[in-house]
């Protein structure tokens, strides 16, 4: 039995210099698993609770010593001696121990750190790479990356209201060529921005954060970068947006402050539809406020057959909310963020539910990241098909891309790359 003999939680820093939780799980054999959890900036109101200390004398109140203490005392007492290979049982133990619907007592940052560290230890004990431990022999599909090359909204201090402008190298034959494509576009964009006298500083997720006058102007510049890098937009590369619309929704209107617009739900759907008509946009995330289900129904009716409509704040990786969305025909894709729900077992359940309903699943990082690359292994192990893990800069983002390169190398000839075919529920 892969018995857990020790568990250690600690406070470490994420990519924004804020505290987060790391956990080590030691097995009877001497094998250790280590994991660190991410943290978001734009968060859904129904996400599992990230436990912070609130002590303003430490890290401006953002310390996580309470969550760490919960690992080292209460969680340790409950899982020491358990079999690390029984992931579902261990995760259920954590859920029951917490006793709330949103991990508010122990903290999702505590439960997730333990859940991930247990999986890493069990994979090491079994002599398996993590992606193989997650997916068995069936995990062989590399994901199409959504590469965030321009940051706006809550991820950057600029005039862009839309939070992320991304490129998706769908025309590549394999993941390594897709990564090269994204990197070449990123560097071409840097050259173009510099020539226009715009800053080339980067935001939280590694994308540039220039002050474009409009979303349209930003997309035009990205199109130039794609062409300048030697690729054809619409064939080799498609575009994706993360509106994070909950961040600029107020009093029933969508306030695009950068463009001086105040739009109703229907008008904002049309605004996004017009952008999709002018540019090769294949995916729009959080195009409506998380509670604007009428707006979501409208945008799904208008765009859902040709555009991937991803629910992030809408679904928060929660099967109960996703089930309701599926029943009402809201969106056609879910963003998967492991810290939104707080255990691996619940994460995998959300991915499986989405697939059964013909929704796509996009595995995602958070804006506050660490060097932990577990989401890369999840993307391959579950054959998710897409991953969103930032730009082509900042080592906290590159760590995931590099892990995917290693996995592709490990898989060898059996590795597949879906490209456009991952948008199996669209008619384009």
Swiss-Prot record:
The active site is at residues 205, 337. Binds a second Mg(2+) ion via substrate during catalysis. GO terms for cellular component: cell surface; extracellular region; phosphopyruvate hydratase complex. Pathway: Carbohydrate degradation; glycolysis; pyruvate from D-glyceraldehyde 3-phosphate: step 4/5. GO terms for biological process: glycolytic process. It holds the Pfam family Enolase_N. It is an enzyme of class 4 (lyase). Its main location: cytoplasm. PROSITE patterns: ENOLASE. Its EC number is 4.2.1.11. Catalyzes the reversible conversion of 2-phosphoglycerate (2-PG) into phosphoenolpyruvate (PEP). It is essential for the degradation of carbohydrates via glycolysis. This is Enolase.
